[in-house]
Amino acid sequence: MKEIIFALPPSTENTAELYDYYKKSNCKIKIYDYPSFKTAGKKRQLREFEIEDLLFRKPIEISDEKTLGYYANKVVLITGGGGSIGSELCRQLAKMSPKQIIILDIYENGVYDVQQELKFKYGNKLDLEVEIASITDKDAMSVVFEKYHPDIVINAAAHKHVPLMEHNCVEAIKNNVFGTENVLELCEEYGVDRFMMVSTDKAVNPTNVMGATKRMCEMIAQSYATRGKVKCSCTRFGNVLGSAGSVIPLFKRQIAAGGPVTLTDKRIIRYFMTIPEASQLVLQSGAIAKNGEIFVLDMGQPIKIYDLAKNMIKLSAAQNIEIIETGLRPGEKLYEELLVRTDELDTTENDLIFVEKEKPISYDEVE
């Protein structure tokens, strides 16, 4: 026996249990996607066991009318729109019949890729504009706001690499904190209805520069919410599978090179979600937001990075690849804190989305 094919309904428990059993067999594991209402009538093929399958839970999908209707006929500006999350936000929004999408990023290659992808898929049915600018350049951003007068601004522009930001803290503050404040000031000036910020679990009790800057961004956004001119909300989520600079591409490169696979500590655990899940969470939380909320997602059980590395090596069918510990980096946590404690959270109409109860500080205090 050389291959094992999973042709099962998407049941978290069963899939995880069977995977644990069969991964010891040295057989290649493939998946035949089980027919569902959405895939009925479509051609299905055998596929490789992908990284997303290692979450062993159903993908989170948004199909509620409230979210879909909220973005219809709106002009939406996405900063950092060429990045992993930003580009997926563009893909998701394109399905929601917006009046116009403006993709803004300083990284032109990422913007170009998503622009071409959406043009090919939607053609003239989608009003799509691209602007190359940095959120740290307020004058350039002002030109963009004057040109488009967006209804909704989603701020996904940020420096996110923890080790790099430890050594480049001035740039982290300049881009993440002051850049976010630039965007918020312009939102007020140009009468934007809603500002939504992409945040991170590293903003909870931060131990590194990147997390501290994102916590500052949350506080700034909440302080602007108290002024009543722009509705503001923030959305926290954990590590995103396959995003640029994440551990998954690193492990893939190391496995392809024959090893070793390096991780800082075998005890590290992280919450994970897919890029589409993270993007949909941002969009749904924005649609249900009132003003000043920090949203967090129940992402299920955290995953050991060591187990993830072992599973990736197993899926690659590579032999004799060693896993080496390199030691925790400055500011790195063994355990990320996302939901903190359930008694600190309020529920929402979505069972997977919660709101932190912490009261925002005033604009004067932030200043």
Each predicted region: which residue ranges?
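A solvent-exposed beta-alpha-beta segment
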Residues: 1-37, 109-113, 121, 128-129, ...
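Proline-aspartate-enriched helix->loop->beta-strand connector
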Residues: 1-4, 98-99, 145-154, 162, ...
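Strand-loop microenvironment adjacent to phosphate/nucleotide-handling motifs in alpha/beta enzyme folds
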Residues: 2, 26, 66-68, 219, ...
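Flexible, Lys/Arg-rich cytosolic regulatory linkers and terminal tails that connect or flank
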Residues: 15-75, 188
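Conserved Rossmann-fold NAD(P)-dependent oxidoreductase catalytic core, especially the SDR/UDP-sugar
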Residues: 23-28, 32, 39-41, 155, ...
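N-terminal Rossmann NAD(P)H-binding glycine-rich loop of SDR-like oxidoreductase domains
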Residues: 76-96
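Conserved glycine-rich Rossmann-like NAD(P)H-binding loop of the short-chain dehydrogenase/reductase
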Residues: 98-113
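Conserved Rossmann-fold cofactor-binding substructure of NAD(P)-dependent oxidoreductases
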Residues: 129-152, 331
